[in-house]
Amino acid sequence: MAEKYCRVTQMLGKQSISFANPVYIQGSASIVGKKEGEGPLGHHFDVVEEDDKFGQKTWEEAENVMQQKSAGMAVEKANLQMKDIRMIFAGDLLAQSTASSFGIGALGCPVYGLFGACSTMGESLALAAMAVAAGYGENVMAVTSSHFATAEKEFRFPLGYGNQRPLSASWTVTGSGACVVSAKVSRVKITGVTTGKIIDDGLKDSQNMGACMAPAACSTIVQNLKDFGRNPDDYDKIITGDLGYVGQQILLDLLEKEGYAAAKVHQDCGILIYDRETQDTHSGGSGCGCSAVVLASYIIPKIACGDWKRVLFVPTGALMSKVSFYEGNSVPGIAQAVVLENAEN
């Protein structure tokens, strides 16, 4: 009789995974543009480039270079070489993910291309953690990027048009962040993930993405708390990706209706990265690079030094395309959650 196959399940609740053995962030790095360097977190980033074209001829080529550089720095900080990376999970905002194709493609590593809009860093980090936890790779990378000029060209208006932006609009971050996830013990570990659902409340205003994404953020956060049997105060911080000032208040109101008070522990990468009073960024920052660079150069170091013991990282995405928008469709949202902890916790 064939021996019955047995496995230890790591599934938890309805949408979560609790890793039987934690995986670790071995190295992380970020590269940003001039505007991001002038913001409150400017001194945290690894590289601040004064030239938003990064020495290239086009904005798109600049974004390619950002991904290459952030990936290279993350590998170097992990004391590895690119040949040690088993696979890369990469994504961006451009059509057919060309920044990842041309940027990461030049590194010669196996790649999975992803699209989760501005939630892509959460998606890529969750998948990298699952791959390492399952034994599919010892060192796996998660990397994403965005660029203000490429996003404006792709989704909004030509830069020379000079359109008036509403106060609910966000500012796409020029930046790329990368993390090397490994089985080797380091100071920051990933202990679980919660996979988000697509939530569509029928909102159609692409200039108010925070409102479009807030219900998805609420859905994922609530499910994480239920699956892990936790309350918001069990996290030092619950940090969303790019809800901005508008989306943050909506999220907190929605969580209150679900019975969770999270105002004391909630932060948002889109709020942290810019000073809206002096930088004219309205609701805050957005883009795949927003949560990625804040994670790589601010959140992870805060956990590594012990300032924070446990953080719920929840990047958020507005799942629209220029075609769906022009056809009058709504803007669905999604949020992916990753539980980050100090290794001694």
Residue ranges and their predicted role:
Residues 3-60, 158-222, 227-230, 263-280, ...:
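Condensing-enzyme catalytic core mediating Claisen C-C bond formation in acyl metabolism
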Residues 25, 59-118, 234-249:
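Conserved beta-ketoacyl condensing-enzyme motif
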Residues 34, 199, 247-249, 319-324:
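Short active-site-adjacent structural elements
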Residues 63-79, 125-127, 212-227, 294-299:
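Short, well-ordered amphipathic alpha-helical segments that serve as non-catalytic structural scaffolds
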Residues 91-96, 118-119, 144-150, 196-198, ...:
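Acidic, glycine-rich active-site loops and adjacent beta-strand->loop/helix elements
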Residues 101-104, 243-258, 323-331:
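Short glycine/threonine-rich loop-to-helix capping motif typified by GTGT followed
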Residues 241-282:
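Active-site pocket-lining segment
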